[in-house]
Amino acid sequence: MVKSTMSAVLLVLHIFVLHLQYSEVQSLANTSSHDFSYLSFVYDATDPELEGSYDYIIVGGGTAGCPLAATLSANYSVLVLERGSLPTEYPNLLISDGFVYNLQQEDDGKTPVERFVSEDGIDNVRGRVLGGTSMINAGVYVRANTSFFNQTGIEWDMDLVNQTYEWVEDTIVFEPDSQTWQTVIGTAYLEAGILPNNGFSVDHLAGTRLTGSTFDNNGTRHASDELLNKGDPNNLRVAVQAAVEKIIFSSNTSGVTAIGVIYTDSNGTTHQAFVRGEGEVILSAGPIGSPQLLLLSGVGPESYLTSLNISVVASHPYVGQYIYDNPRNFINILPPNPIEASTVTVLGITSDFYQCSISSLPFDTPPFSFFPTTSYPLPNQTFAHIVNKVPGPLSHGTVTLNSSSDVRVGPNVKFNYYSNLTDLSHCVSGMKKLGEVLSTDALEPYKVEDLPGIDGFNILGIPLPENQTDDAAFETFCRESVASYWHYHGGCLVGKVLDDGFRVTGINALRVVDGSTFPSTPASHPQGFYLMLGRYMGIQILQERSASEDAIRNLGFQENILDSPKSTSSFAF
C-alpha cells in the first residue's frame, strides 16, 4: 500500500515537472490530416510519359529520397522511382493504431511492409511504399547526437543542418500528448537513475525525456511523402511501382558515368529514363536496396561479381560490406489491469544503451519481426513491451545477392548480432538497468504479486536473470532474446564506397543518400537524421551546381552550356 501511494505521488510530481518544462519548445507542426497534395504529380510506372531525360533521377521515395527530391526540384527536373505503391491504398499506415497491424498483414509481394529473415535467423522488415520506413515505423523523431557528426568524416555546415531540421519539423513533427503508460515508464526511468529529466526535446540528450513524434495528437501519421508537397510540382514526377533493375553507365576517356536507369512496372514491362548534362542518378533505396542495386549494376567486389557472371563496371570491394543492425532486447509484462495502447514518446538515454516502451492491445496474429520469431508466445491481454537498444553497434555483416538478375528477389543479409563483445557488454548494462526500472515504485502497480525487486510481474517470454550480478546469465539472455530494432544501416559507407559528398568513388554522376552511408546509428532513432540528410544534400547539390554554373559563366561558356537542356528546369522527352 505504501509503495502504491508512493507511485501515485511520483506520477503526479513527474507530470507536474514535465508540464513546466514542455512549454519551451521550437516551432513544430500543427495537427492536421495527412496532406496528399503531391498526388497531382504521381504516376504509375506503366505510364510511358515517364520515359525521357531529367536532371536528377532518385531511386527510392523513402525517408531521405522524398526531401531530397523536393529540394532539387526547386531548380531542376526530378524523377523519383519508388518500388512500392501509394500509402492511400493502405489506410492503416496513416494511424498510430495501425503500427502493429501493418506488421501483422501478410506479405503478398506488394504490401507496404516487406518481410525478410536475416541469415542470423531473425525476422525483419523493409518499407515498400512511398514514404519508405517513415510510413511504417513507430513515429519516433529525434535529432542526431551532436557527437555523431564529428565521427562521420564529413565537414558539416551545422547552421544548415539545424535549418534543415526545422524545415522537416514544421511540417511533420509534433509534440505528443502525455499518454498514461508513457508517463509511468518515464517516471520509472527517472527513479532508476536515467537522469536528468529533460522535459520535452527533440535533441538527443542523456537522461529521460518526451521526444517528438511523426504521429499527431489525433493519431494521424505524417511521413516523408508529405515533404514532396514542398517541391515544385512543375519540376517533379514520382513514379510508384517502379522497380529499378539496373543503373545504365557510359564509359569514355573521362571515366565511367551513370547516365540513367532501367526499371520495370507492375506488369513486368521494361522502361528507361536518363539524366542529362550535369545531372546525376542518386540512390536512396536504403541499406538493403542501394547495395543490392549497385551489385546488380556491376559495382562491387570484382571477384564476387565475376563469380555471378555480372559484368564488372567498377571494382568496389566494400559495396554490401559493413551493414549493421542495432540489437533490440526486451521484457514484456502483462499487468493485472488493462492499460491503454501507446506508441513510443518517452526515451531513457545513456551512453551505453537507449530504452523506450510501448503498450499494446492483445495480439491474435503475430506481428512479424516484433518478436524474434513467429513462434514467440502471443499476449492474450494488454501488455507493455519495455525495450533496450544497443547504440552503434560495432558488430557488422554483409548484403549479398540472392539473384544475380532480379531486383525483386531480396538479397541475403547477415548482421552478426553480438559478434563484437562490446555490443554484448552494452546489452548486459542495459538489461541490468531494465531490472532496476522493473524494481521501481512506479511499476509496482503493474505486478500481479506483491514481491520485491524484479519479481511479481507476469512476464511473457524470457524473464530477466534473477541474479542481477551474473554477467554470464545476462549475456545468455541477450543472445537468446535478441530481435531487430529495425534500425539497420550501412552497406555503402562514406569513406569506403562514397566520398564526403556521398558520390560513389570512381564513377561520375552517381551518389547514394540514405541509411546505407554510415556505420553507426545517429541517435536513439535514426528517422530525424535521414529526413534532414535528404534536404541537406539537396541543398548541397544545388549549391554545387550554382557554383559550377557561375564558374562556367565566368569562363564565357554560358551560351554553349548553361542554355543547353541539362540546365533548364523543364522536362525534355
From Swiss-Prot:
Binding site for substrate: 356, 485
Record: active site: 487, 525
Reactions catalysed: (R)-mandelonitrile = benzaldehyde + hydrogen cyanide
Enzyme class: lyase
Matches recorded under SUPFAM superfamilies: FAD-linked reductases, C-terminal domain, FAD/NAD(P)-binding domain
Compartments where located: Vacuole, Aleurone grain
Alphabetized UniProt keyword annotations: Disulfide bond, FAD, Flavoprotein, Glycoprotein, Lyase, Signal, Vacuole
Binding site for FAD: 63-64, 82-83, 129, 133, 137-140, 244, 486-487, 515, 526-527
Keyword Membrane: no
EC number(s) recorded for this UniProt protein: 4.1.2.10
Glycosylation sites: 30, 75, 145, 150, 162, 218, 252, 267, 309, 380, 402, 420, 467
InterPro entries linked to this entry: FAD/NAD-bd_sf, GMC_Oxidoreductase-Related, GMC_OxRdtase, GMC_OxRdtase_N, GMC_OxRtase_C
Intrachain disulfide bonds: 427-478
The protein's required cofactors: FAD
Segment forming the signal sequence: 1-27
Gene Ontology CC terms: aleurone grain; vacuole
GO molecular function, one term: oxidoreductase activity, acting on CH-OH group of donors
Gene3D superfamilies: 3.30.410.40, FAD/NAD(P)-binding domain
Family to which the UniProt record says this protein belongs: Belongs to the GMC oxidoreductase family.
Protein's job: Involved in cyanogenesis, the release of HCN from injured tissues. Catalyzes the stereospecific addition of HCN to a variety of aldehydes in vitro. It is a major seed constituent, and could have the additional role of a storage form for reduced nitrogen.
Subunit and partners: Monomer.
Protein name: (R)-mandelonitrile lyase 3
Native source organism of the sequence: Prunus serotina (Black cherry)
